[in-house]
Amino acid sequence: MMKHVKGMDGVFIMRDSLVTVNLTPGVRVYGEKLIEWGGSEYRVWDPRRSKMAAAVLNGLRGFQLNPESRVLYLGASAGTTASHISDIVTMGRVYCVEFSPRMMRELIEVCRVRGNMVPLLEDASRPLDYMRMVENADLVYCDVAQPDQTGLFIRNMDCFLKDDGYGLIMVKARSIDVTRSPRKIFREEAGKLRDSGFRIIDQVGLKPYEKDHMAILVQRSV
């Protein structure tokens, strides 16, 4: 039994697992399971390796990704989640911003076989540095474990997000302040987004896959 995930082309729930249609059949990115079904190959999207997968499995809805979407990914690391987004936006682009040279080396290897992924060795807190290399985005996705993660997310949305686009941030409370209640931190970060002209579309916690994380989906206020 296969169920399509609303709003996300090529994403399904199969046998209680989240899967994407493999853009590069036969090729794994992080040792994920491959499933052949109905003449297509699917990659299991592991929610313990991908916060976006965890958010979707926990019920996050309200944004659209289609084959022509352009995505700006802040904190792409070695490309685990970005590769699944690449499966979805087959004719679009995934601009992968990563600051760590070590992670970038691994990310480049993923990008070599996925022509719609663009690796950028840049600091996500300085969007003007890569402004000429990135097109306007349908989705700005942020998974950066820094105290100012919401601030840099907002700056990137101000630079790159289309008027009708979406922003999705994985707020890590312990990276902001280990001494305070995660619930209070999540409320404050959501407030920063509202104060900057964005409305909250949806938000979900990431338990049991991640502790003290909250996925917050936003869009520009009308």
UniProtKB/Swiss-Prot annotation:
Which annotated residues bind S-adenosyl-L-methionine? 80-81, 98-99, 123-124, 143-146
* Protein name per Swiss-Prot or TrEMBL: Fibrillarin-like rRNA/tRNA 2'-O-methyltransferase
Instruction: Look up and give the organism this protein is from.
Output: Methanothermobacter phage psiM100
Write out the similarity annotation. Answer: Belongs to the methyltransferase superfamily. Fibrillarin family.
**Transmembrane stretches, start-end:** none
One GO BP annotation of this record = box C/D sno(s)RNA 3'-end processing
In alphabetical order, the GO MF annotations are: histone H2AQ104 methyltransferase activity; RNA binding; rRNA methyltransferase activity
Quaternary structure, per UniProt, is: Interacts with nop5. Component of box C/D small ribonucleoprotein (sRNP) particles that contain rpl7ae, FlpA and nop5, plus a guide RNA.
Q: Where is the organism placed in the taxonomic lineage, from the top?
A: Viruses, Duplodnaviria, Heunggongvirae, Uroviricota, Caudoviricetes
Q: Which gene encodes it?
A: flpA
EC number(s) reported in the record: 2.1.1.-
Q: Which UniProt keywords apply?
A: Methyltransferase, RNA-binding, rRNA processing, Transferase, tRNA processing
Methyltransferase found in the keyword field? yes
Q: What does this protein do?
A: Involved in pre-rRNA and tRNA processing. Utilizes the methyl donor S-adenosyl-L-methionine to catalyze the site-specific 2'-hydroxyl methylation of ribose moieties in rRNA and tRNA. Site specificity is provided by a guide RNA that base pairs with the substrate. Methylation occurs at a characteristic distance from the sequence involved in base pairing with the guide RNA.
InterPro entries recorded: Fibrillarin, Fibrillarin_CS, SAM-dependent_MTases_sf
